[in-house]
Structure formats: C-alpha cells, structure tokens
Amino acid sequence: YFSLHGRGDPARALMTHAKVPFENIEFGFDKWPEHKPNMPNQQVPCLELKDGTKMGQSIALTRYLGAKHGYYPSADALAAFHIDQLIDRYQDVGTTIYKPQFMKEQADKDAAIKTLAEETIPKFLDEINDKCKDGWLVGDKISLADFFVGGLYTNYLANEHITYGKDEWKSLLDKYPNFKGYGERYAAENAAYLASRGKHAI
C-alpha cells in the first residue's frame, strides 16, 4: 500500500493483533506507476499470499483475514451482518475524512473540515454512541468492525501527525466521551501495532 494508514491499516492491525507474521511493503506515490500493472484491478492495498495469490479490495481482503483468524463469525449470519453493517456505514466517513490532506486551496480544505466536523462524523458517532460505552462494537471481543472504526480514532481524531483539523478533532472527542473511551481501548489493545507502524498524517 502507499505510505499511508488509510485503507491498508485494518489488515495490518488485524494481522499484528493475531500475531501473524507478514511483510509490510509501503511505497510513495512516485513509485505507483511501476507497481500498478501488477496489482489486482490495478489498485492497492494488495494482500499477497505465500503461494503468490494477490488479493485486492481492502474490505474483502480484511474480511478474509478476519474469517481466517477469528475476528469475523462466518458461521453466524446475524453477527456477521452487524459487523458488515458497521464497516459499510463507516465508509461514509472513511472515504471522505482523508480528502482535506490532498486539497490545495485552503478555502476548499476549510469547507471540507467543517462538513466533516459538523455533519459527517457527528452523525456517525451519534449512531454508534451506545455501542461505544464499554467493550467492543459487536460481541464481547474485538472483531473485524473494530479494526475499521477504531482507525477513525487512531488514524485521524487522535493522530498527532495529522496536518489538518486538529482543533476540530479534539472538540469532537470532547463531545463524544463514549467514542473517546472506545478509541483509547482500541489503541491500548493494538499498542504493539501502533508502536511499530509508520508515523503518517493519514
């Protein structure tokens, strides 16, 4: 994946939590043209298995890892639905929160941050507020959903290396103590991964 947290983070965090040995290969955007032809659908992230099989699509490949290592209940259709529903819903946030990083005009960046901080993220946090009171989002142990939603805390709202919206993100955490507490639990549970990963802005 690129030298970002972004779409590659859930899979990396899950494998580290599961103590699965893996090689993390990151590269800059300048190297993308040489990697692109060899990637599934010419996209990243990509998960390459020992036999050379290459998997694309970040949610699908992370779901595969979750099922393989005990974070996704393939045999329990209802529990699987609750996990999938949270991941799908989170995409409304996850596919927009990174965009200010790449905006060149300050006015555009400010407008995007305002929408995120006042509309997009609060709406999501209101929906999951009760689920964040204690423990994990689905069931009594960390699940696939947490590796996505927990990244909202570690990659953005509490990421000291982020270059935009810091005041807005701090204010959101103050307004949503349930989510802040959940994020702190997620960070503690994944302390080994967070200590080993790159210090990226997003």
Question: Could you describe each region identified by the protein language model?
Answer:
Residues G198-I202:
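Eukaryotic N-terminal low-complexity, Ser/Thr- and Lys/Arg-rich leader segments
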Residues L65, L78, H82-A188, L194:
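GST-like fold's C-terminal all-alpha helical module
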Residues N38-P40, A191, A195:
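Intrinsic low-complexity, intrinsically disordered segments enriched in polar/basic residues
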Residues Y1-T115, E119-K123, L137:
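GST-like domain detector, emphasizing the conserved glutathione-binding G-site
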